[in-house]
Design a protein with these regions (language model features):
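N-terminal low-complexity, acidic/polar interaction/targeting segments
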Residues: 1-179
Length: 179
């Protein structure tokens, strides 16, 4: 199967067809860089398809991590469009892939394909108004996170410094929720 842009993408509404990597026990948010170990054949095929083209991969969580052969009904419809930074094939046949979350997406439909999941996705526009209340809430969240970092020694101090420089509320939430 080949990677394809949907007709809607050509119209400029942000829709596109992207290979899907179903995730177990992890959610990848925008701006998050994470290593993943992949062993299922369909998932490896999806990664290979993405590598042959623009290295874009849809990262969406499975509803039940124990499901070994998920169907479209087993996958949440909101995920993250990711970019493959590095892919390494391991001797046991599995793959280690480093991905960076780029944009939140919504699965519009699954496109029939035997080798891997292929999804027609649309980018989710993140909307917020920059008001005094939003800015105050962001400062409050940053202060609360600072207290959390002081109590949790596993979080490096650099993370706190990074969080204090974020002025986009959506990115702030995505960065903090990882910890």
């Amino acid at each position: 199967m080949f990677f394809q842009k949907s007709d809607n993408d050509r119209q400029g509404d942000g829709a596109r067809a992207v290979p899907l990597l179903p995730l177990r026990d992890i959610i990848v948010f925008p701006h998050m860089v994470v290593p993943l170990f992949v062993g299922r054949e369909k998932s490896i095929n999806a990664l290979e398809e993405a590598m042959r083209h623009d290295k874009e991969i849809l990262l969406a969580a499975q509803k039940k991590a124990k499901t070994n052969d998920p169907t479209p009904d087993d996958i949440f419809t909101v995920g993250t469009l990711g970019h493959i930074i590095q892919l390494l094939r391991l001797p046991d046949g599995t793959v280690k892939v480093m991905v960076e979350g780029k944009r939140r997406t919504r699965i519009r439909k699954f496109i029939p394909n035997e080798s891997f999941f292929l999804c027609d996705v649309e980018l989710v526009e993140e909307k917020y108004e920059s008001t005094v209340e939003v800015e105050a809430l962001a400062r409050s969240v940053q202060a609360t996170f600072e207290g959390y970092v002081k109590l949790n020694k596993r979080i490096p101090p650099e993370t706190l410094m990074q969080v204090q420089t974020i002025d986009d509320p959506s990115r702030l939430a995505d960065t903090i929720v990882v910890h």
